[in-house]
Regions:
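Non-catalytic cap/lid and distal C-terminal segments of serine-dependent acyl enzymes
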Residues: 1-192
Length: 192
């Protein structure tokens, strides 16, 4: 959170009235025995920790609004893959989802076309329901990031199928400059 300047970005947006006041929770999602953000199966340890421990703890100890409409999940790199799977597969928990420079669509060690319907059931077969349950679906990537090509193609495929997705690219590689800009943009869109 320090390198990402999360507190500064959020404080400035809230003070300027550009973002709704919110609590930001950053978890260590790289749990032992899990394979991070590259498959639904590989992230079950983190999903369980997030849904069954972190969210209940926050709701018990802080003044928050409960329900999916009052929650967002976003992440960068591996966290973007986790946001893709956990955020999009659990619309009853999160209705705002952001992926910043995720390698989930390829671009590091290859990667081909993703079967969106297999990975996120209902994304293509029930697009209207998918769009209604995901108020904000946001994807971003650095313009010099090797992931930009696969990400752009994935967004084009989703849009062609009727998925409502916001896509932005920012100057930079797989590093903090585009991720800070992504958070700055995403935070202004959610909870409106």
């Amino acid at each position: 959170m320090q390198q990402g300047l999360t507190a500064n970005i959020m404080d400035n947006l809230i003070a300027a009235g550009k973002a709704i006041p919110m609590i930001v929770v950053s978890a260590n999602s790289n749990l032992p025995g899990a394979r991070g953000g590259y498959s639904w199966e590989g992230m079950q340890n983190f999903r369980d920790e997030l849904v069954n421990s972190i969210i209940p703890f926050v709701e018990k100890n802080f003044r928050t609004k409960s329900g999916a409409a009052s929650r967002a999940m976003c992440g960068l790199s591996m966290g973007g893959g986790q946001s893709f799977y956990i955020g999009l597969r659990t619309p009853e928990v999160f209705s705002n989802v952001g992926l910043f420079s995720s390698g989930i669509f390829g671009g590091i060690a290859g990667g081909g076309d993703m079967d969106f319907e297999k990975e996120i059931p209902g994304m293509l077969s029930a697009t209207g329901k998918f769009n209604a349950s995901h108020k904000i679906f946001y994807i971003s990537c650095g313009e010099q990031d090797p992931r930009i090509g696969p990400t752009t193609r994935a967004v084009e495929s989703m849009r062609k199928a009727g998925v409502e997705v916001i896509f932005e690219s920012f100057p930079g590689d797989h590093e903090w400059q585009p991720w800070r800009k992504s958070l700055h943009s995403f935070a202004q869109k959610i909870f409106r």
